[in-house]
Amino acid sequence: KQDAISILRGISIRMPLMIYGADVDNEDTQLTIDNFTSLIDPQSWDEFMPQGVTKQHFNHFKKYYDPDIFSAAAKRIRAMARAADRLSVEQRIQRITSIFSSFRNPDKETVLTPWRVVNMHLGDTLGGYNFFNDNYAATIDEPRFIDHGKPTDDVFRSDAHILEINSKSGLYPLYMAYGIYRARVKESMFAIETVDAEQRLWDKTVAE
């Protein structure tokens, strides 16, 4: 019994993050306890779920979850993410990182680095656009630029490409992508004045 409770607790802690990252092409499609495993890619499942808990194991344990409560929680998490899509890039980043801050670390070995720590780490080493004030006590509405000279210039070029092979939540690549995005805004031949224009350039930056 205790083993089953421990496994259920381990699964439950991880569910919100995995629901957030579920591969859902059509947001009108309801995410349910029955289709949950089919919407999570194998690599993410192996990375985040407790060791030894396969999709087959989950399907055995899913009978202990209330389907209606699961669907309602999933709908709320996905709605929070979708709402960010209608905001400016800066506001969207603030909203996304706020959502991530509500997720619990899956276990002692899998730590979701807080957004503040990401900004401290990359701000101190590479520079770029930082979302916290000078002493990292609070977020700021307009990101401040930290210039470390050549390292900053080399990394945050408009044509730079970032390979991040160990990202769990995606906050490190998010910081890097925003710096490259701002370089592209600066070099753009056309004024980026609408949310739609921002979104097109942001999507292109992330895709490349």
Question: Residue locations for each model-derived region?
Answer:
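Class I S-adenosyl-L-methionine
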Residues: 2-207
